[in-house]
UniProtKB/Swiss-Prot annotation:
GO cellular component entries: membrane
Organism for this UniProt entry: Buchnera aphidicola subsp. Schizaphis graminum (strain Sg)
Protein name as catalogued: NADH-quinone oxidoreductase subunit G
Binding site for [4Fe-4S] cluster 3: 228, 231, 235, 263
Cofactor: binding comment: Binds 1 [2Fe-2S] cluster per subunit.
């Protein structure tokens, strides 16, 4: 630590930071534009000027750019001297020369870094009286609105998009005072993290188009700290609501997970929560297919009779639902009748992953820690599509070699320009094993494209090269053996090695192979090894801990009359099982019950159905890919806006039914009650109570406010329904209040922050004030709690199996392919996401296409699982012959297709 004197006061600052970052970490305010914690320093905007003095006797000093100045012990600077203040005010005035006077109509207003910095520099009068240069705006897709006339030329957008996220279709054009940031031509931004431009840009050049359609100022929305439900990463998000609709999702800072960035699916994939056509009241279908709407009491009475009428009711849980909901279902039907809803293949994969997390000492890194590895192997996962934020972390890991080299030459890590140039030449090592092309191939040292079986064989060869005690690999051809040896040598010479695998290809063998490589590295005891498993949904691991049998076993029990009825909780059977088998089951539906917040095919076909609430309308806990339990919180009460609705979180419905059956008082009054019960019954959940404060938590006797203190129009929220203002809803489950009344400032006790605001800091840059140091941990520490402990003893138990060589057959073998938009279940109901879902197609190899005389977009037909398919084809250079890729997870493409065999496919002439 260095001692720095600022305006006559001494501060201890980190010598690894630049002066701007160090001052901000110390709570001092220096205006800035081009600098950003994840982008480093460029010195382009000249806004962060301060005066530096040679000694205490120096009265003149010199202006320096604090973002480009290292922290050196004994440095004397002034932020508030007249020279610095006047210079910074003049810079703002120059930057505003061509900026329009449109704050009242600008969507960034009240959430704008430019506004904050203009106020901070006390600039309030413009001397420029001439014409402003104007630009034409571009169409950038359905997510982002472009308003180029607001640009101040800070270069943040291209530095993030091109240098950080590796996007290629956004650049800077022009020169001098006439530069343009955009695409070569109109078109959708191609990068999966393009939405972060909205928060990276300090002005209103890039704004949220989904928010524009129903716009509210930041201070007029109600917020809650949420967890993204779209993949297994568990990114922290801030969810904003107004008039009973989710209006916006922003990144919520978490040092160990998403940091400052989230993917586009997490940011824009929320409109399914606002659907008007959603279940709102309990329904009962009659034999004549009539639908009767029930009130609350009738619904509970019928549900009670349902469980009394049928013996051994199977309860099907859901990977997209919270631990609380799944536990409540398990308690109602009993452990022996609890189905986790996963397929046989996924169930075995998740059991293996959980056993590894529970029993092994292999290190499971956080998302942020992934960036620190210098060699990464990805086995079987197309990360850009299945876990985009991890893919972005892998890209940063590849660039970190440049930072290490820069350090050798005395270049600090925050100096962006030279490091960016070095990273073009020197990168860390990345090896990818997949069935077909991925978007990370462009940064990989080598990509191995082959069948799953062949990937497992090659992974086994690498493990053998690391530990010769393993069985010989004579089965592998000489070229692949040489490649395996080369990769093993790179691994041995690395400081930190990461193996990434997962369950998306539904292969237990490939997970075992990845574990074997990690163990063989660990045996060397010369370098650090990490292991990351990507799973299919937000709470796959949480549900896996509760146990239960697969969906195939559940249907088998029904068929064999070992069970008489079934209840689906937030689960669509049509996503997992063929349409033919589902239709057979639903022919007689009076023994089928469903609880959900979407009109899924399962919900529609059930004999009795209860409407639940989605994740924005409820609070609960989920477990992410690293075994971190995280709490998400209710944003608003949907029944506040319409008392006629009968909407409850699933665990409350199940609690009402359970108490009625047992003729007892309701045991789970609030969220704390049910958390306490399952944490007692499952020792692994013992620490989960600390994942978030309980409902009685207060700061200075106050609950935490969900709304900013400037929130307006509360008395008019329901005036169109009733002019009499009702009292605000009471939240018995959490420490938050449904209003602006309550605590909202940085505090050592609060890590679940609904929204980022601090006096003078209205934009997302306000997160600076909630951190111990800029870009590092929150004042209160990271939220969430790790459920698994790592053992210190070295693991030496390998998985022994004989991977089969893929033999070309006369049948076609079905494999999955994924797209970021369209494979996750709930976002397929989102209107804005539907516009961005690629058309469905069949993926086959170019070799097979040539053999069959097929070209791109030729229409083919085939039959699988008693279902006919008719789709255009796409040709892959790398896909193994006789493999057929299908968009698993899309409507009409159930998970049960994976691994099935197709006898033949034929072209349909149009």
């Amino acid at each position: 630590m260095a001692k720095i004197y600022v305006d006559g006061k001494a501060y201890c600052m980190s010598e690894s930071d630049n002066l701007l970052q160090a001052c901000l970490s110390s709570g001092l305010n220096i205006p800035y534009f081009c600098w950003h914690p994840i982008l480093g320093s460029l010195g382009a905007c000249r806004q962060c000027a301060v005066t530096q003095y040679n000694s205490s006797l120096d009265n003149q000093g010199k202006l320096i750019m604090s973002c480009m100045t290292p922290v050196i012990d004994g440095t004397i600077i002034s932020i508030n001297d007249d020279t610095s203040k006047k210079f910074r005010s003049n810079i703002v005035e120059l930057l505003l020369t061509n900026h329009p006077h449109d704050c009242p109509v600008c969507e960034e207003g009240g959430n704008c870094h430019l506004q904050d910095m203009t106020v901070m520099t006390t600039h309030n009068f413009r001397n420029y009286r001439f014409s402003k240069r104007t630009h034409k705006n571009q169409y950038l897709g359905s997510f982002i609105k472009h308003e180029m006339n607001r640009c101040i030329g800070c270069y943040r957008c291209v530095r993030y998009y091109r240098d950080y996220a590796d996007g290629t279709d956004l650049d800077v054009y022009g020169a001098n005072n006439n530069i343009y940031f955009g695409r070569i031509e109109h078109g959708v931004l191609e990068n999966e993290h393009s939405g972060n431009l909205i928060e990276i840009c300090p002005t209103g050049v890039f704004t949220d188009k989904t928010h524009s359609k129903k716009y509210n100022r930041k201070w007029d929305m109600q917020y809650a700290p949420g967890i993204c439900q779209n993949c297994s990463i568990g990114c922290n998000i801030s969810i904003g609501e107004r008039y009973g609709e989710i209006r916006r999702i922003e990144n919520r800072y978490h040092e160990s997970i998403n940091h400052y960035l989230i993917c586009d699916l997490g940011r824009f994939g929320y409109s399914h929560t606002n659907l008007k056509n959603r279940p709102k009241k309990p329904i009962l279908s009659t034999k004549e297919n009539d639908v009767n709407i029930l009130n609350f009491n009738k619904a509970i009475e019928y549900a009670t009779n349902f469980f009394q009428r049928y013996k051994n009711v199977i309860g099907v849980g859901s990977i997209r639902s919270s631990i609380e909901n799944n536990f409540a279902l398990q308690e109602l039907v009993g452990k022996e009748n609890f189905c986790n809803g996963m397929s046989d293949k996924e169930n075995s994969c998740i059991k293996l992953i959980l056993d590894t997390l529970k029993n092994n000492q292999l290190y499971i890194p956080s998302l942020k820690e992934i960036e620190s590895y210098d060699t990464i192997l990805i086995l079987g996962e197309d990360l850009t599509q299945t876990a985009p934020r991890i893919a972005l972390a892998v890209r940063q890991a590849m660039k970190n070699k440049a930072k290490d080299l820069a350090e050798l030459y005395g270049i600090p890590k925050w100096n962006a320009a030279p490091i960016s140039q070095i990273s073009e030449i020197y990168k860390n090592y990345l090896y990818i094993f997949n069935t077909h092309e991925t978007k990370l191939d462009n940064i990989a040292d080598w990509s191995y494209f082959s069948s799953i079986d062949n990937q497992v064989r090659f992974a086994r060869a690498i493990a053998y090269e690391l530990d010769k005690n393993l069985p010989d690999i004579s089965f592998l051809d000489s070229n692949l053996r040489k490649k395996a040896s080369l990769i093993a040598k790179k691994i041995i010479s690395s400081k930190k090695v990461l193996i990434i695998s997962g369950s998306h290809v539904y292969s237990k063998s490939i997970i075992q192979a990845s574990i074997n490589i990690a163990i063989s590295i660990n045996q060397k005891n010369i370098n650090h090894v990490g292991l990351t498993f990507v799973t299919s949904s937000s709470n796959t691991l949480g549900l896996g801990i509760l146990g239960g049998f697969s969906i195939e076993n559940a249907l088998k029990k029904l068929k064999n009359r070992e069970a008489e009825a079934i209840i689906f909780m937030e689960y669509d059977l049509y996503r997992y099982i063929s349409k033919h088998d589902c239709d057979v089951l639903f022919k007689k539906n009076d023994n089928i019950m469903s609880i959900d917040h979407q009109y899924t095919q399962t919900y529609k076909n059930s004999g009795f159905a209860l409407p639940s609430v989605n994740f924005t309308e409820s609070s609960g806990t989920i477990v992410n890919f690293e075994g971190r339990a995280q709490r998400f919180f209710q944003v608003y009460d949907p029944m506040f806006y319409d008392k006629k609705n009968c909407l409850y979180v699933s665990w409350k419905w199940l609690s009402f039914i359970k108490s009625k059956i047992e003729k007892k008082e309701i045991s789970w009054i609030n969220l704390d009650n049910i958390i306490s019960e399952y944490s007692d019954k499952y020792p692994i959940f013992k620490k989960i109570k600390t994942a978030g404060p309980n409902a009685s938590f207060r700061v200075h006797g106050q609950k935490i406010a969900r709304s900013p203190h400037r929130s307006s129009g509360r008395t008019a929220l329901r005036a169109n329904i009733n002019i009499h203002e009702p009292s605000q809803p009471k939240d018995a489950d959490t420490m938050f209040s449904f209003s602006m009344e309550g605590y909202s400032q940085p505090n050592k006790s609060i890590s679940h922050i609904p929204f980022a605001w601090f006096p003078g800091w209205n934009s997302p840059q306000a997160w600076n004030k909630f951190q111990k140091e800029i870009g590092r941990q929150l004042i209160s520490g990271d939220s969430g709690v790790h459920l698994f402990k790592s053992n210190k003893k070295i693991l030496d138990i390998y998985f022994h199996f004989s991977p089969k060589k893929f033999i070309k057959e006369k049948y076609w073998y079905v494999i999955p392919y994924y797209h970021i938009f369209g494979n996750e279940e709930l976002t397929q109901y989102s209107s804005i996401i539907k516009q961005n879902i690629p058309l469905e197609y069949v993926l086959i190899s170019e070799l097979d296409g040539l053999e069959l005389g097929l070209k791109k977009n030729s229409i083919v037909e085939f039959n699988c699982l008693n279902q006919d398919f008719r789709l255009p084809i796409r040709l892959s250079k790398h896909l193994t012959s006789k493999h057929i890729g299908l968009p698993i997870g899309r409507k009409g493409f159930p998970i049960s297709l994976i691994g099935e065999k197709v006898k033949s496919l034929w072209e349909v002439m149009s």
